[in-house]
Amino acid sequence: MDPTAPLLTHGGEVEEDYAPARSWTDVKRVLSTESAKLWMIAAPVGFNIICQYGVSSVTNIFVGHIGEVELSAVSISLSVIGTFSFGFLLGMGSALETLCGQAYGAGQVNMLGVYMQRSWIILFVSCFFLLPIYIFATPVLRLLGQAEEIAVPAGQFTLLTIPQLFSLAFNFPTSKFLQAQSKVVAIAWIGFVALSLHVIMLWLFIIEFGWGTNGAALAFNITNWGTAIAQIVYVIGWCNEGWTGLSWLAFKEIWAFVRLSIASAVMLCLEIWYMMSIIVLTGRLDNAVIAVDSLSICMNINGLEAMLFIGINAAISVRVSNELGLGRPRAAKYSVYVTVFQSLLIGLVFMVAIIIARDHFAIIFTSSKVLQRAVSKLAYLLGITMVLNSVQPVVSGVAVGGGWQGLVAYINLGCYYIFGLPFGYLLGYIANFGVMGLWSGMIAGTALQTLLLLIVLYKTNWNKEVEETMERMKKWGGSETTSKDILA
C-alpha cells in the first residue's frame, strides 16, 4: 500500500496521509494539526474521567471528616476491591477501543452498536464472576493482611456498593462507543452533572442526615447508575448512525470477542492492580492506619492526574485506530509522537506543582497534623510517579488502538510483578524503608515498563499495522444489519 495514497473519509472527501516531515515548518504543521485532533477528544474524555474519579475522591473527602478508621475502610474498599473490579471491567470494555475505532475509520459505522451490545453482554456476565469478591470482601481483606479494625468496616462498605459494580457493565462500553466516533462532549457534560449531584447527595446523606458510610455508599450507587443510564439515553436518542437498535448480531462471534476482551482486560488489569498492590502491602506495615491513609491521599492525587492521562489514552487510542482503519500509517505515527511529547510536558508541570504544595495539599483530605506530615514526606515520590504516569498511559493507548494487547500484557507482567513488586517488597520490608521503600521499588518497575514500551513504539512498522488492521476488519466486519437482525 502506498502510504500517501488518497483515502475516502466518512464524508466522502479525499484525505491523504501526511508527507514526511523534513523541515521545522513541516513539524510545526503536524504538531498543530495533531494537537487539535488530540485535544478535541482528550479534553472532554479527560474531564469526564476526572469527574468519574472525583466521585470516589469526594466520597473519601466526606468520609475522611467522619474519622480516620472510616477513611481507611472506605479507601481500602474503593482502592482494593473497587479498583480490582474497575480495572477488570474497564479492560474488558477496552476491546471496543480497538474494534470500534478501526471499524469507524474503515467506514463500518453500522457495526459499532453491535460491538457495544456484545460488550454489554460480556461485561454484565463478568460482574457475576466478580460478585464473590464483594460478598466476601472482609475475609479477602483479612487474607491480604489488612488489620481487623479496617477489614470489617471496609467489607461492610463494599457489600453496599454491589449495585455500582453492575453499572460499570453498561458505563464502559457506552463510553467506548461514543469515544470511537469522537462524540465526547456529551460524555463530559454527563460526568460534570453526575459529580455535582454526587457532592450534594454526600452532603445530604452524611452531613445532614448523619448516615455515615452507609450514606456514602448510597450516593455512590445512585451516581454511577445515573451516569450509565444518561449515556445510554444519549446513544439511543442522538447516535442513529452507529445505533440501529438491539440486534441478534450481538451474539454472533461472541467467543472471539470474549478472547479479545480478556486480552484487553489482562493488559489493563496488570497496570491498575499494580498500584493497588502497594495499598495492600502498606496495610501490613507497623502503624498501618497512618501509612494507609497517607498513601491513600497520595494515590487520590495521583489518580486525578492519571484520569486525565486515561483521557489522553482514550484519545490516542481513537486517533491510532481511526488512522489505521483509514490506511494512514504516517498519521498514526505522528499522532503518537505529538501525544507523547505533550504528555511528558504536562507530567513535569504536575510534578513541580506537587513538590511546591507538598506541605499543604493533604489538608483537603484530613485535619490530622500527623497525617499531613506523613503525606508531605511522600510528595517527592508522588511527583516522580506523576511524570512516569504521563507517558505510560499514552503508550498503552497506542497498544489498544493497534490491537497489541497481548504483547503489552507480557511486558506489564515482567516489569511490574517479576521486577517492580519484589523490588518494592525488598526495599519496604527487608531494608525497612517502609512505605517509601515499597513505592520506590514499584516506581522502578513502572520506569522499566515505560522504557520497553517506548522501544516497541520506535521499532513499529506502521505500514504493516495498516495491513493487519484491514485483515481484522474483514474478519470482524460482518454484513449490514437487516430487519431480521433487529430484536422486536
Swiss-Prot record:
It holds the Pfam family MatE. Keywords: Flavonoid biosynthesis, Membrane, Transmembrane, Transmembrane helix, Transport, Vacuole. Highly expressed in inflorescence tissues, especially in floral epidermal guard cells including those of the anthers, stigma, siliques and nectaries. Also detected in the meristematic zone of the root apex and in the elongation zone through to the fully expanded cells of the differentiation zone. Its main location: membrane. InterPro entries: MATE_euk, MATE_fam. The chain crosses the membrane at residues 38-58, 73-93, 121-141, 150-170, 187-207, 218-238, 262-282, 296-316, 336-356, 379-401, 408-428, 439-459. One of its GO terms (molecular function) is antiporter activity. It is found in: Vacuole membrane. One of its GO terms (cellular component) is vacuolar membrane. One of its GO terms (biological process) is flavonoid biosynthetic process. The keyword Transmembrane helix applies. It is a multi-pass membrane protein. Disruption phenotype: Affected flavonoid levels in the plant. Altered root growth, seed development and germination, and pollen development and release. Enhanced growth and early flowering in comparison to the wild type. Belongs to the multi antimicrobial extrusion (MATE) (TC 2.A.66.1) family. Multidrug and toxin efflux transporter involved in flavonoid metabolism. Required for proper reproductive development. This is Protein DETOXIFICATION 35. It comes from Arabidopsis thaliana (Mouse-ear cress). The lineage of its organism: Eukaryota, Viridiplantae, Streptophyta, Embryophyta, Tracheophyta.
